């Protein structure tokens, strides 16, 4: 199998370099894995990754968020501790972000052309603002509110 020199491969190489330059391992590793998959026999699995990647990523992210509760590093708050303004705002923020993420998934499925812009914005945020790549779903949810689509 020979190497494929196409615009996607060049973009992935650019993302790897951007990830290294910005010291963001999430971008570097993600782009490297996808480049390896694209350039090898693993390319046949890309459609499965495309179909189930977000769902698997959300599951892994949720496991990572819940792990400190299970390990005991973070104690489950007593009911009385839940009744303060910071905790209430945190709960509301969680509800809003989950709702926006749901709208974002729908928008990305219905208007896939917008995914490119969302990805570019997310990559810039991850690379230069030390963000994490959960942005596309929330960004798509916010975009759906702005353009009136879901």
UniProtKB/Swiss-Prot annotation:
Disulfide bonds: none annotated. It is found in: Cell membrane. The chain crosses the membrane at residues 1-21, 27-46, 52-72, 82-102, 123-143. It is a multi-pass membrane protein. The keyword Nucleotide-binding does not apply. Signal peptide: none annotated. Keywords: Cell membrane, Membrane, Transmembrane, Transmembrane helix. It comes from the Bacteria. InterPro entries: UPF0756_TM. Its main location: membrane. Belongs to the UPF0756 family. It comes from Glaesserella parasuis serovar 5 (strain SH0165) (Haemophilus parasuis). The keyword Membrane applies. One of its GO terms (cellular component) is plasma membrane. This is UPF0756 membrane protein HAPS_1649. Pfam families: DUF441.
